[in-house]
Amino acid sequence: MAFNVENFTAIIADKGLSSSNKFEVAIAFPSTGLTSILPETELNLMCDTATIAGKTIQSTPEIHYGVRREVAYNAPTFDPLTLTFYCTEKLAEKKLLDAWQNIIVQHSNPENGNGGNFNVAYYDTYAKSSIITITKLSVSGEPVYKHEYREVYPKTVSAIELSHATSSGPMKVSATFNYIYWKDVTQS
C-alpha cells in the first residue's frame, strides 16, 4: 500500500500524536531516612527529563544446514533508567542522590575524618523496596502508559559543571538507575 497523505492526516486527526513533555515521575525510596534530605514529592516535581527504558531479548545464532537464524534464549536485559532533575538553590537533589549512593557504598562518613570504610550495604537495604514509576500522560492529563521499575538504585550520579560564562538557566543533575525489571502497569 502506497503512502497516502489523506489517510495519514485522518489517523492524526482521530488519534492525535503523543507529546513527550507530558509525564509524571514517582520515586519510592528505600526506608533509610532519605526523605529527611528531600521529600519524595519534591524530588518528583523537580524531574525535568525521564526515559521509558527499553528491553532487549538475548539471542544466539542457531546454525542448521544451509539456514542461519538468531533465536531467543535466557532472560531479557533492560536498559538503564536515566532521570534528570532541576537543582534547587541548596542542591538538595544532588545531596539526596549522593546520600543514596553513600548508603550503597559508604565512602564518606562525617563521624570519621578519614572518610568511609567502603563497606557495601546489603541489596535489601538500598534497593529491594525502591520503586520508580513513570507515567506518560495524554494532552488532557490522563495516564496512557505507566512503567514501574522495581528494586532501583542510583548507579551513576552525574557531575555538575559550574561556569562563569553561564548566567542563566537552571542547574541540573542526572542519575542513571539500575533496576531488576520493569513492568507495564497501565490500567486498561
Model-identified regions with their sequence ranges:
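Glycine-rich, low-complexity intrinsically disordered segments
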Residues: 1-188
